[in-house]
Amino acid sequence: MSSEFVISMAEKAVYVTLMISGPLLAIALLVGLIVSIFQATTQIQEQTLAFIPKIVAVLLALIFFGPWMLSTILSFTTELFSNLNRFAG
């Protein structure tokens, strides 16, 4: 097992991780921005107001993107374990 191979597998693992976490982080960022703009325009200074919409939005996004996220991580894991003898040898 060469160092280039290990680096490419680590790169693919990081890519899959970013691809899976990206939609949830983007939804949380967008909802947080909308709530912050709402708080700035109405001059509400409640710090806990931003958490509930973010949690609800991320849970809804998890329900929506969950099957895709699961299939993506499952295909990566299946590829990793099916080629394990090539990796170790």
From Swiss-Prot:
Listed GO biological process terms: bacterial-type flagellum assembly; bacterial-type flagellum-dependent swarming motility; protein secretion
Membrane topology classification: Multi-pass membrane protein
Report whether Cell membrane shows up as a keyword of the record: yes
GO CC, one annotated term: bacterial-type flagellum basal body
Which compartments does it reside in? Cell membrane; Bacterial flagellum basal body
InterPro entries recorded:
Bac_export_3, FliQ
- What Pfam families does this protein's entry cite? Bac_export_3
Source superkingdom: Bacteria
> Transmembrane stretches, by residue range?
18-38, 55-75
Q: Does this entry carry the keyword Phosphoprotein?
A: no
Q: Which family does it belong to?
A: Belongs to the FliQ/MopD/SpaQ family.
**Annotated function:** Role in flagellar biosynthesis.
- NCBIfam families per record: fliQ
Quote the protein name from its UniProt record: Flagellar biosynthetic protein FliQ
What is the gene called? fliQ
